[in-house]
Each structure stands twice: as C-alpha cells, then as structure tokens.
Amino acid sequence: FDKEAQTYELWEANYPRDFIPHVNLGSNYVNMAQYDKAVAETQEALRLSPDQVTSYANLGATYVDLNRLDDAKAAFDQALARKLDDGFLRQQMYFLAFLRGDAGQMEQQVAWGAGKPGDEDLLLSIQSDTEAYYGQMNKARDFSRRAMDSAVRADSKETAASWQVNAALREAELGNAALARQGVAAALALSPGRDVKVIAALALARIGDAPRAKALVGELEKNYPTNTMLKLYWLPTVNAASALDTGDFSQAIVDLEAAGPYELGQAALFVNYLYPAYLRGQAYLLANNGNAAAAEFQKLLDHRGIVLNFVTGVLAHLQIGRAYAMAGDTAKAKAAYQDFFNIWKDADPDIPILKQAKAEYAKLQ
C-alpha cells in the first residue's frame, strides 16, 4: 500500500490536473483505514473533475465509514443534482439509509436497480444482508437467490458466486453449518475466484472445517503470493478462525496481530465487517477474559459505517452480553442481550444462535 501511495503521489506531482491519481490514492487510503486522507484526496479529485459519479460515491462512502452521515448525504445529493447516477452510488445511498433506519429509502434503491443488469443483483444481495441483520433468514435466502439468478442472467458467474458465498458466511455465523457448507460448495463450483475462495475459507473455518479452510488458504498463498491485503488481512483472519475452531485462542490472537493496523480499513474485498475484531473478541471469550472480549465486540458497534448491515453487526450485541456475563456484570450483560432481542424481535424462531441466546439469557435471571 505504501508503494502504491508513492506511485500515485508521483503521478499527482507530474500531472497536477489529472483527477485519476487522486481517486486511486483515496481508495488506497480507505483500504489502509486512513479515512481523513481519503476524504482530502477524493475532494481534490472532485475539484479537478466535478462530473465523476464515482468520486461522489467514494466521498459519501468514506463519510459513511467515518459515521459522518449528514456529510455522506450531502455528497450523494450533489451527485444527483448534477444528474449523475449509477449502481455504486445507489449502493452507498442504500448503506446510508440502512444506518439511518430508513426502510423507504432502502426500498427505493432496490427498486432503482430492478431490471438493470449488474446493478439489480448487487442491490438484491445487499437487501439480503439487511433481512439477515434483522433475523429474517427466510427472506434473506430469497433475496440472495434472486441476486444470484440476476447475476447469472447478466452473464456474471463470479458475481453470482460472491453472493452465494456471502450468504454461506452468514449461515455460518448464525449456526446453520449444513446450509453454510452447501453454499460454499455451490459458490466454488460456480466460480472459484480469489475473493470467493477467501470468504469460502472463512465460512468453512467458522463451521468447524479447519482442514478444508487451510487447504484453500494454501491455494491462495500459492496463487497470490504478493497480494498485500491477503497477506496482511484476510489470510490471518481465516487462520485465526481456524485456530478458534480448535480452541487455540492464543494462536488466534497472534494470527490477528497482522491485521490490526488494517482492520478498520475496507480490506479491498466485497466484504469487511470488521472480522478481525469480531474474532479477537471470540478469542478473548475462549480465554475467559470477558472485559477484553467486550472491548473488541464494542468496536463493531462503534464503527457501524464499516460493519454496515452484515449479521456480525447485530451479533456483536449478543457477544457483548456473553462477555459481560463472563466478567460477572449481570446488569450490563442483560442490557446487551435485550439490545440483541429488540433488533431480532421479528426474527425467524429456528435460528440456532437465537435459541442459544434465549437459553443463556434465561440463566441470567
């Protein structure tokens, strides 16, 4: 990333009127979790070329990452006022609406994508994550199926596989191991590309199939030996998940050290969800260190603009409840469980992690 940044800075110096290096450097800073620098670069890109829809979307997305929601809306409104529009902008507008709890605006973005190849599937998959966030797994699976079908119709099997493996990871986190395993197999059969393999490995590690996860890690290390984000973020995260599967919390914590500087960044993949912090929290739970675990899970609540609408964002409430229960703070534990149950008040009743949570909460009374 540092070398990339130097390249773009040299480009900027040699071609001061070119907006492209500012766009690229801004994206680079987002991956590095240097959001204020990303804002400055993207604003400069817009000054040099004010009719680039991607720059408005990038600026708004960066403000979302920073939880600066009013600034994000202003960036999106500026784009629309200039009659600039595309699927990436609508994706970011959707995420803003989610964080504001604006169901009508979320529906508007999904409706905008209807019938637009390449946009429709993206917005349907995003909606699937929102349904899962609220525990509506039957609806989530339906939206994921529709997203995959739309991507296949648009002749993009790799994208369809991405939505499939995203759904599989969701199932893994909720305790639906069989569905997760089926989803991983289907995604890899459809299109075993780099990003799909990364999330497949993570999902497999999360459901207790560390050997298969490690095999995929080996393939990724062999095929992408110089990929910075794989080496520093994703492979350590998958390795930590595999260590947790075997109960080796010390190794998991060590594995996650590499990801630490980048865990608040966007991780250059179609998911992020602050996984290193989530897994580190689970490692501390295994280590019987409730207070340290709670601090890690709290990161997901403090950085909702990064976690967005993935299930780890809502499960963080449950994990905080578990952490405080372990630490002996029953009042805080109960409050965290209640936060989780409030968000999942209309959840499908058969979700394994929900059943576990209810049983745990009953013992707190």
Task: For every predicted segment, state its role.
Residues 3-10, 39-43, 69-80, 102-116, ...:
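Alpha-helical repeat scaffolds
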Residues 13, 47, 81, 115, ...:
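Structural signature of alpha-solenoid helical repeat scaffolds
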Residues 16, 50, 84, 117-118, ...:
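Short coil turns that delineate tetratricopeptide repeat
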Residues 19-20, 35, 53-54, 86-88, ...:
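Helix-start (N-cap) detector for alpha-helical repeat units in TPR-like alpha-solenoids
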Residues 334-365:
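Terminal, low-structured helical/coil segments at or just beyond the last alpha-helical repeat
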